[in-house]
């Protein structure tokens, strides 16, 4: 009887241990699933297709549109906004507790696309007029087609261009108003473009050269006059003065 009770207790203990292990595995799988499908950042991939997809931005708590290249993506990649919200709408940054470390490790192992550099991605950057307003418009190597605006420092106005979706620069704005607000009259004397700088430097060099040549000519003329005066004084000696005085006496 005692052996039977002991056997039952052992079975109950093993069943409890098994259920705990199973629940732990399921919880780990769920956390891993949440991480892979909702917490990682979007990945455009190395291919150059142009597929509209949705990804869950856990910081904003919303699903956002992006352009997928067609390969080397991750699980945070949905065909529709509804599918994205269904999977991740209730997920927050603190949903998985201490998964921040594992999330960073996973992000580093996923091949990521070149970081999009445009005017919307400068939350921690200091404003630099040359970087945000004088740089040329850059379409980039990707093949998406985003209408953007850039500031033309020579015309002091914002013009539209097509942004490919990757490897742009900071002089890229989603609206003309944002472009003008960022760059128009931000600097009373904005730095000149490289071509204008070369022209200005060349003009200054020519002016300095002309002034130097003019000063040299004036100096040489003065030296020549002084030498001529000294030569005349040497020829007209005191003996010549006496001879001239005697001639004048005889004439009188």
Curated annotation (Swiss-Prot):
Tell me what effect the entry lists for residue 148 to C. Answer: In DIAR3; likely pathogenic; results in decreased inhibition of prostasin due to abnormal SPINT2 glycosylation
Compositional bias per record (Polar residues), positions renumbered to this chain: 100-111
The molecular function terms of the Gene Ontology recorded here are:
endopeptidase inhibitor activity; serine-type endopeptidase inhibitor activity
What is one GO cellular-component annotation here?
A: membrane
Where are the glycosylation sites? 57, 94
* Recorded superkingdom: Eukaryota
Q: Where is this site: Reactive bond?
A: 48-49, 143-144
The record gives the membrane topology as: Single-pass type I membrane protein
- Domain named BPTI/Kunitz inhibitor: residues: 38-88, 133-183
- Which UniProt keyword terms apply here? Cell membrane, Cytoplasm, Disease variant, Disulfide bond, Glycoprotein, Membrane, Protease inhibitor, Repeat, Serine protease inhibitor, Signal, Transmembrane, Transmembrane helix
Signal sequence segment: 1-27
Membrane-spanning ranges = 198-218
Where in or outside the cell it occurs: the entry states:
Cell membrane; Cytoplasm
Give the InterPro entries listed for this entry.
Answer: Kunitz_BPTI, Kunitz_BPTI_sf, Prtase_inh_Kunz-CS
The chain's Cytoplasmic topological domains, given as residue ranges, are 219-252
Q: In which tissues is it expressed?
A: Expressed in placenta, kidney, pancreas, prostate, testis, thymus, and trachea.
Tell me which parts of the chain lie in the Extracellular compartment. 28-197
UniProt-listed PANTHER family: KUNITZ-TYPE PROTEASE INHIBITOR 2
How does the annotation summarize its subunit structure?
Interacts with TMPRSS13; the interaction promotes the phosphorylation and cell membrane localization of TMPRSS13.
Q: What is this protein's function per UniProt?
A: Inhibitor of HGFAC. Also inhibits plasmin, and plasma and tissue kallikrein. Inhibits serine protease activity of TMPRSS13. Inhibits serine protease activity of ST14/matriptase and PRSS8/prostasin in vitro.
The name this protein carries in UniProt is Kunitz-type protease inhibitor 2
Q: Which organism is it from?
A: Homo sapiens (Human)
């Amino acid at each position: 009887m005692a052996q039977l009770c002991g056997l039952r207790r052992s079975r109950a203990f093993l069943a409890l241990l098994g259920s705990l292990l199973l629940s732990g595995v399921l919880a780990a799988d769920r956390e891993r699933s949440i991480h892979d499908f909702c917490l990682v950042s979007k990945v455009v991939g190395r291919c150059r297709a142009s597929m509209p997809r949705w990804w869950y931005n856990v910081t904003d708590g919303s699903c956002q549109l992006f352009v997928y290249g067609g390969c080397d993506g991750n699980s945070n990649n949905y065909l529709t906004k509804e599918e994205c919200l269904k999977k991740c709408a209730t997920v927050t940054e603190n949903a998985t507790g201490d998964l921040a470390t594992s999330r960073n490790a996973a992000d580093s192992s996923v091949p990521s696309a070149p970081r999009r550099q445009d005017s919307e991605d400068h939350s921690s950057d200091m404003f630099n007029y040359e970087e945000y307003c004088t740089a040329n418009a850059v379409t980039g190597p990707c093949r998406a087609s985003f209408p953007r605006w850039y500031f033309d420092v020579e015309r002091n106005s914002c013009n539209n261009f097509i942004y490919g979706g990757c490897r742009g620069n900071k002089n890229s704005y989603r609206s003309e108003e944002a472009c003008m607000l960022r760059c128009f009259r931000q600097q009373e004397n904005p730095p000149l473009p490289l071509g204008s700088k070369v022209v200005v430097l060349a003009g200054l060099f020519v002016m300095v050269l002309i002034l130097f040549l003019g000063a040299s000519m004036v100096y040489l003329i003065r030296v020549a006059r002084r030498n001529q005066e000294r030569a005349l004084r040497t020829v007209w000696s005191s003996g010549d003065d006496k001879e001239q005085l005697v001639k004048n006496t005889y004439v009188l």
